[in-house]
């Protein structure tokens, strides 16, 4: 039997906590036997004293074990259970292509996703722009879809890592969100509860990233790879660029449209293609579905070329109560905005810099995201035809096409776009899409 205040005191004085002490505290968070004040105190001591790698692994596993951990053995699946997690960005629609692509190559992806947070779009919000799409199938249906289709994208239920919800809510109001051991545990507790064989982390870098500097993004990626492997799940991470909107669009319905066009081959933004492929390659190799980069890329290109990936996406949408002909007739089903009009720069020049975060916030301001949890989303609004870094813009080539609910909203968004995109006389040097791969 432990006392919460003694655990806090031990960490306050700079000592490492044992696995038993950490489990006692986390179970107390779940069972409401630990007070909010005690959670806040421990969070602050961890913020200042950090945690050793064994402590980080214990914290993550205790949070994972605070609720249901999915077990797939009874389904006798003939491939690995794999997933991807992104720290979030703008136009980051990779999940919608990656899940079907990897499933078409023999993987099983039980993807538990989130809603939009701050300036970043949420995969669930995007999928809910599809009429009827059910993000909360019951457990048996979820398992059926994974077995039959290979991929399902659903929302987090209260039974998964419940301690994290209470821990995070306290961190949010006590200035202890940006602690790497706490971020790592929060991300991984939910992902590892999926019962995965392998995981790839997409950690964003740049003006639209969750972490403010390259060094902090790198530290988070290294922490996640170390902890997840320590918890027994093969994990690699990619540091990918978020100094500009990743896709050509940003919003909800507009990104779903781009995902379908990507899968069918109608249109593939080259940067989005690079990042999606790189993440899929990691999943295939870690899941032992390919022996190396070349084999993985060949398999992935094949399922894009032969239509299998698009077919899997269509089957997932139908299985989750969306239209059965969505891939063929997406334009018929996705909501359209009242006003669609391009915004042009005031001068000619090359796009040299983009405040990606500000562009994400502009989508939120138009109604495409939530300022508070109770807000409803306008799925139709957003940006398409986004200019990329290095593009030459003038009276012919717009900065973006804005889809808005009315003229006022369009004007506000146009102002935000112009303020967020800087022009120069010369094109900037091109930046990589993937900066670094991190493995154990």
UniProtKB/Swiss-Prot annotation:
Q: Name one GO cellular component term.
A: cytosol
Q: How does it assemble?
A: Homodimer.
| Family of the protein in this entry | Belongs to the thymidine/pyrimidine-nucleoside phosphorylase family.
- Write the Enzyme Commission number(s) for this entry: 2.4.2.4
Q: Which domain of life is it from?
A: Bacteria
Any GO BP annotation:
pyrimidine nucleobase metabolic process
The metabolic or biological pathway listed in the UniProt record of this protein is:
Pyrimidine metabolism; dTMP biosynthesis via salvage pathway; dTMP from thymine: step 1/2
Kindly give the SUPFAM superfamilies that the UniProt entry links to this protein: Nucleoside phosphorylase/phosphoribosyltransferase catalytic domain (SSF52418), Nucleoside phosphorylase/phosphoribosyltransferase N-terminal domain (SSF47648), Pyrimidine nucleoside phosphorylase C-terminal domain (SSF54680)
Designated gene of the protein? deoA
Q: Which UniProt keywords apply?
A: Glycosyltransferase, Transferase
GO MF: 1,4-alpha-oligoglucan phosphorylase activity; thymidine phosphorylase activity
Matching InterPro entries = Glycosyl_Trfase_fam3, Glycosyl_Trfase_fam3_N_dom, Glycosyl_Trfase_fam3_N_dom_sf, Nuc_phospho_transferase, PYNP-like_C_sf, PYNP_C, Pyrmidine_PPas_bac/euk, Pyrmidine_PPase_CS
Q: What class of enzyme is it?
A: transferase
Q: Report the function annotation for this chain.
A: The enzymes which catalyze the reversible phosphorolysis of pyrimidine nucleosides are involved in the degradation of these compounds and in their utilization as carbon and energy sources, or in the rescue of pyrimidine bases for nucleotide synthesis.
Q: What is this protein called?
A: Thymidine phosphorylase
Question: Reaction catalysed?
Answer: thymidine + phosphate = 2-deoxy-alpha-D-ribose 1-phosphate + thymine
